[in-house]
């Protein structure tokens, strides 16, 4: 089975080439980035973050798509600039999950950042972690701690945790390691990295598990042309409990897919 995770930075511009999605929806994927991704990798499940798409419109995207008949959406419940066009997550699946949850335990999910899907052989969390630059206290004292409680309270079957974690793990995951030493910007604050280390007490970063010495990134600052210059960060991950690592076939990064400031990550499991 193949699972892809991608912070798409706005799904509308990545499913139709003219960047516009009418209120009536779209019946087929245009010759654009999402279609390129699907044709290249043929994933069984796609976890999408930062859809910036209300549920009402998401449900009109390829409603008769035979390849992914099961599509689930979560949206921001805010207003104004934090309304339904902000944040958001989605799961597209060839296989029908046994259960899909949009709220879990004590996690506040008003921005549509979290989805949980249970399948027969494993469970899956798709999440778009808040950037600490906008709400440091919430991120470090509430969100991360609640996620840690959720993932460590779920050990009876494999739990794949994926998405945009908005944190750098090690020096291999950032083009300029001095940024880690300074620890003065979102994504490299000590509190964020300490919580990520806590996640890894019972879970493994699957890309680093398969490629221990590779320097490959999943996010670039577009304003400074970071992608063209190779100045990136790896902040998108697949995590899995240590005791289930024998089910991992491969975990890779595809930085050839355009359309976002992030690129997709791919997990293959047995």
Description of each model-found segment:
Residues 1-5, 9-17, 23, 29-35, ...:
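Active-site regions of metal-assisted phosphoester/phosphodiester hydrolases
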């Amino acid at each position: 089975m193949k699972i892809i995770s991608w912070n798409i930075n706005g799904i509308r511009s990545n499913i139709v080439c003219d960047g516009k999605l009418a209120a009536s929806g779209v019946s087929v994927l245009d010759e654009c980035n999402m279609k390129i991704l699907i044709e290249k990798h043929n994933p069984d499940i796609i976890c999408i973050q930062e859809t910036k798409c209300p549920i009402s419109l998401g449900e009109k995207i390829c409603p008769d798509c035979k390849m992914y008949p099961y599509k689930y959406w979560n949206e921001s419940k805010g207003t104004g600039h934090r309304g339904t066009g902000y944040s958001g997550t989605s799961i597209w699946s060839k296989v029908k999950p046994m259960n899909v949850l949009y709220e879990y335990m004590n996690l506040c999910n008003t921005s549509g950042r979290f989805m949980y899907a249970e399948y027969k052989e494993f469970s899956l969390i798709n999440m778009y972690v808040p950037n600490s630059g906008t709400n440091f206290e919430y991120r470090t004292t509430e969100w991360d701690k609640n996620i840690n409680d959720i993932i460590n309270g779920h050990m009876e079957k494999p739990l794949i945790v994926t998405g945009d974690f908005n944190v750098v793990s090690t020096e291999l995951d950032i083009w300029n390691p001095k940024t880690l030493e300074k620890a003065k910007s979102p994504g490299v604050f000590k509190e964020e990295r300490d919580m990520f280390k806590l996640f890894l007490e019972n879970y493994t970063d699957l890309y680093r598990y398969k490629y221990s010495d590779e320097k490959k990134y999943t996010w670039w600052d577009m304003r400074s042309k970071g992608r063209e210059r190779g100045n990136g960060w790896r902040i998108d991950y697949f995590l899995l409990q240590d005791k289930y690592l024998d089910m991992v076939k491969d975990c890779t990064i595809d930085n050839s897919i355009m359309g976002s400031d992030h690129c997709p990550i791919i997990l293959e499991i047995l």
